[in-house]
Amino acid sequence: MRIVFDLLMRIQKRRQLPLLLIGGWAVQAHGYARNTLDVDCLIAIENDPVMAEELTKAGFECFEEKPSFRRFRHRLQPFLILDVMRVNAVTFEKMWAACEDYDMDGIPMRIPALKHLLALKIHAAQNEHRVEKDLGDVLALLRGNPGKISAAELQGICDQYGTPALAEKLSAFL
């Protein structure tokens, strides 16, 4: 996956395209190591054409597209998969302002703050096929980062992106 991280770093520098590393790698950066087979990043939707152009130049092709994300696979190395989540500029700027630097095996990346990563995971868990994995990540992040998220913050995240019942269940892990 180092090749994908290196590519993302080069795109950021060459095109001044801010992006955040999300998904399993960001979960690992926040202290919960788990296997992941792809790389996920987050961009402002306004930067999507530039990102797609750069990925195409680097040998990637889009093989799945939904309103909020696109999945890319390398044409010659199909096990290299990059998911690009797209959000509006206001959401991205809020997350960018609070993001953290992270050294990914010598490659400088940025990851969402813990509260924003939890919001992404709780939002993703609303999709039936993702509940187990994403809520597992949420529980592991809460357990691995005691005291970093208050009960009120968790309640607010769940109210906005999940359900009140979920907040009640998760608060036991604070």
Q: Model-predicted segments: where are they?
A:
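Compositionally biased terminal segments of proteins
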Residues: 1-174
